[in-house]
Every structure is written in structure tokens, then in C-alpha cells.
């Protein structure tokens, strides 16, 4: 179930302030954030936001196709190392 339309999308206040400040000054430096649950808005297109994955910040360049998605979708938290090999012939 999605979020109610009357509430609007969730974006962390600190992240929104930083994006608005960069839009006003035409600055395109990387913005660090820990807010993986923030929704990507059209005003964020063209910015690079470093999203924390629990260990490091992963830079994500925001494009038009990402609008409406969450920042955390683009910074994976787990590393898949592959399935274990069959141990039948190892004896």
C-alpha cells in the first residue's frame, strides 16, 4: 500500500533544504545523506546525492526516470557473493 496522496511524498527536511540551497546557487556538489527513505522529487534531478548503505556513502546521480522512487533503492546494503557450489565430488 502506498502513501496517502493528501500527505504527499516524504523527504527529510535537511535534505530538502540542501537541495533548495544548491538550486538557488546553481551549485552541483555532492550531498551526503543517511535518509534512504526520502522520495526523489523533480527538483532533485541533476544532483548527485551520496546515500549511506550502512558502511559507506554511495554517490547516486539522479535522473528523470528515478522520480517517485526512494533513495535507498539505488544504494544496495547487501553484497551477493553467489550460491555455494555442489559438494558432491569433493570427498
Swiss-Prot record:
Record localization: Plastid, Organellar chromatophore
Highest taxon of the lineage: Eukaryota
Biological processes, Gene Ontology terms: ribosomal small subunit assembly; translation
Assigned GO CC terms: mitochondrial small ribosomal subunit; organellar chromatophore; plastid
Ribosomal protein as UniProt keyword: yes
A Gene Ontology molecular function term of the record: structural constituent of ribosome
Entry-linked Pfam families: Ribosomal_S19
SUPFAM superfamilies linked: Ribosomal protein S19 (SSF54570)
InterPro entries noted in UniProt: Ribosomal_uS19 (IPR002222), Ribosomal_uS19_bac-type (IPR005732), Ribosomal_uS19_CS (IPR020934), Ribosomal_uS19_SF (IPR023575)
Record key words, sorted: Organellar chromatophore, Plastid, Ribonucleoprotein, Ribosomal protein, RNA-binding, rRNA-binding
Family matches, as PROSITE patterns: RIBOSOMAL_S19
Stored Gene3D superfamilies: 30s Ribosomal Protein S19, Chain A
HAMAP family attached to this UniProt entry: Ribosomal_uS19 (MF_00531)
Function: Protein S19 forms a complex with S13 that binds strongly to the 16S ribosomal RNA.
PANTHER family: RIBOSOMAL PROTEIN S19P FAMILY MEMBER, SMALL RIBOSOMAL SUBUNIT PROTEIN US19M
Family per record: Belongs to the universal ribosomal protein uS19 family.
Protein's UniProt name: Small ribosomal subunit protein uS19c
Gene this protein is translated from: rps19
Amino acid at each position: 500500500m502506498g502513501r496517502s496522496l493528501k500527505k504527499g511524498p516524504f523527504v527529510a527536511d535537511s535534505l530538502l533544504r540542501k537541495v533548495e540551497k544548491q538550486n538557488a546557487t546553481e551549485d552541483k556538489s555532492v550531498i551526503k545523506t543517511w535518509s534512504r527513505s526520502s522520495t526523489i522529487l523533480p527538483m532533485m534531478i541533476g544532483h548527485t546525492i551520496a546515500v549511506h548503505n550502512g558502511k559507506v556513502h554511495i554517490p547516486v546521480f539522479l535522473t528523470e526516470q528515478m522520480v517517485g522512487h526512494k533513495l535507498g533503492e539505488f544504494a544496495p546494503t547487501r553484497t551477493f557473493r553467489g550460491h555455494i557450489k555442489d559438494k558432491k565430488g569433493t570427498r
